[in-house]
């Protein structure tokens, strides 16, 4: 059986690992997952990530906790394979009144909603994180 929504699987694995207070979580790797992990690290939501090469590349994400609680309180898929959500630069969502981020895939790469607004581009809103 093939996996239909690999990003939703990534977010579910992160949520489940944080509920179990795991230090790291591994999952099958893809270019898009690696870019999402890069944005999460850049914004301080995870400690680090590594990609192991091979026949089946794996992405290992090192989770981040603050005083025993997960830094990522909420991570949710926004645009789904069954219902894609594209937004212009002015319509990009503000997550938790600007305290969270929306991860957007644009023509200039994967970036946060703030970076997309600064670059003046819109795109597909992948997920929201706070």
Swiss-Prot record:
The keyword ATP-binding does not apply. Coiled coil: none annotated. GO terms for cellular component: ribonucleoprotein complex; ribosome. Gene3D superfamilies: 3.30.1370.30, 3.30.1490.10. Keywords: Ribonucleoprotein, Ribosomal protein, RNA-binding, rRNA-binding. GO terms for molecular function: rRNA binding; structural constituent of ribosome. One of its GO terms (biological process) is translation. PANTHER family: 40S RIBOSOMAL PROTEIN S15A. Part of the 30S ribosomal subunit. Contacts proteins S5 and S12. One of the primary rRNA binding proteins, it binds directly to 16S rRNA central domain where it helps coordinate assembly of the platform of the 30S subunit. Belongs to the universal ribosomal protein uS8 family. This is Small ribosomal subunit protein uS8.
């Amino acid at each position: 059986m093939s996996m239909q929504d690999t990003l939703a699987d990534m977010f579910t694995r992160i949520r489940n690992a944080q509920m179990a207070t795991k230090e790291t979580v591994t999952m099958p790797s893809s270019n898009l997952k690696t870019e999402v992990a890069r944005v999460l690290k850049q914004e301080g939501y995870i400690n680090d990530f590594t990609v192991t090469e091979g026949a089946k590349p794996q992405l290992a994400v090192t989770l981040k906790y603050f005083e025993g609680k997960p830094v990522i309180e909420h991570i949710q898929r926004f645009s789904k394979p069954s219902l894609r959500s594209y937004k212009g630069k002015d319509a990009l969502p503000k997550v938790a009144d600007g305290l969270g981020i929306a991860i957007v895939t644009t023509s200039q790469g994967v970036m946060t909603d703030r970076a997309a607004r600064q670059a003046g581009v819109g795109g597909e809103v992948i997920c929201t994180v706070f």
